[in-house]
Amino acid sequence: MRCPFCGGPDTQVKDSRPSEDSSAIRRRRVCPDCGGRFTTFERVQLRELVVLKRSGKRVPFDRDKLQRSIDVALRKRTVDPERVERLVSGITRRLESGGEGEVTSEAIGEAVMEGLKGLDDVAYVRFASVYKNFREAQDFQDLLGTLGERLDGEGDLPEQGDAVPAPPDEAVAAPRRGRPARKRA
């Protein structure tokens, strides 16, 4: 494999092990020319998928693009990376084993929304706002209404009129991080 740092033609595998869910093989590589170290992943690809976009254009399926779009929705959220990897692998496997060589971008978007709904509600709303092309605040209210109905059934949200518990004292008086604020004259 070519070195991504210096372009050297040969790299050596220093460590090879399966990922936690055994869906990929993780390899640590080193370049003998520049000493650069990097990681590669080897995954099973059941078939070459083609994505049919809304415009009618056909493009090859890109697992990395799927990963990036989920990562953007999850930015600054505390979700275990292993759960994200399982979500991406699950969506990819479902698409590849669907029996079709061609999949619509809508099917991919719906699969991502379904997965994010079970993973992180904020990421679900973020992704939905881009995927469904929200233009007005009402679009968000409608989505949050359906999300609230789902959560009400699970007992996660307080009923209207219920008291919302106050945050613990340590959350209110948490120490500040970083530089102290400058005094203004």
From Swiss-Prot:
Keywords: ATP-binding, DNA-binding, Metal-binding, Nucleotide-binding, Repressor, Transcription, Transcription regulation, Zinc, Zinc-finger. Belongs to the NrdR family. Negatively regulates transcription of bacterial ribonucleotide reductase nrd genes and operons by binding to NrdR-boxes. Residues 12-24 have a biased composition (Basic and acidic residues). This is Transcriptional repressor NrdR. Residues 49-139 form the ATP-cone domain. Its cofactor is Zn(2+). Binds 1 zinc ion. One of its GO terms (biological process) is negative regulation of DNA-templated transcription. NCBIfam families: transcriptional regulator NrdR (TIGR00244). HAMAP family: NrdR. A zinc finger (unnamed) spans 3-34. Residues 1-24, 148-185 are annotated as: Disordered. GO terms for molecular function: ATP binding; DNA binding; zinc ion binding. The keyword Transcription applies. Residues 176-185 have a biased composition (Basic residues).
